[in-house]
Amino acid sequence: MSRYTGSIYRKARRLNFSILESGKEFTNNKSKKGVKVPGQHGSLIRPKLSNYGEQLQEKQKMQFMYGLNDRQFRRLFAVSKKMSGILTMNLFRTLESRLDNLVFRMGFAPTRRGARQLVSHGHVLVNGKTFDIPSALISLGSVVELKPRAHNLPLVKLALESKAVAPFVEVNKKTLSGTYVRYPERNELPADVNETYVVEYYKRLVK
């Protein structure tokens, strides 16, 4: 399965879940409850899902939120499975350690898609070296910064005006640099994802 590049808004409505983590996809609706499934006429009633269907839906939520294709997600799950500790938190920590995600969490881009663009175009340094691979896993204590030429990009300016900084990173908004201080706690991450279902889904596939 390739990375989903279609409308985030359409996918968010189908999953009844904010992929952008801002709720922006639902700003034209009074609430997420009762949002119609995309299609010719939508659907007023969502069918009850089987256990597998629930696992698949939660996997899709997490997959689209972090902007990964299925192969990338399986690889990260395999990495998380080899780590000591609780697998569900290991999975979140691995996902949160991706470079594109850290650029997003530090408030340098309004979305993860925008963060991937900054990384891919060579605008990001990690510990003083250019990194252009969005999927690179970054170690705790690493310093992530934007090159000076990126400071005036509209994408970056928009993020700095509106994007909150995650509590597990420290950011200097004057130099546009940040440090990955610690792994996030569960209550600092999106609550609308059931990571246990995601783990159950991949346990059958990744040995």
From Swiss-Prot:
GO terms (BP aspect): ribosomal small subunit biogenesis; translation
Top-level taxonomic group: Bacteria
Keywords, ordered alphabetically: Ribonucleoprotein, Ribosomal protein, RNA-binding, rRNA-binding
CDD domains: S4
UniProt-listed Pfam families: Ribosomal_S4 (PF00163), S4 (PF01479)
TM stretches of this protein: none
Keyword Ribonucleoprotein among UniProt keywords: yes
CC annotations in GO: small ribosomal subunit
Subunit field text: Part of the 30S ribosomal subunit. Contacts protein S5. The interaction surface between S4 and S5 is involved in control of translational fidelity.
Family, as annotated: Belongs to the universal ribosomal protein uS4 family.
Record protein name field: Small ribosomal subunit protein uS4
Lineage of the organism: Bacteria, Bacillati, Mycoplasmatota, Mycoplasmoidales, Mycoplasmoidaceae
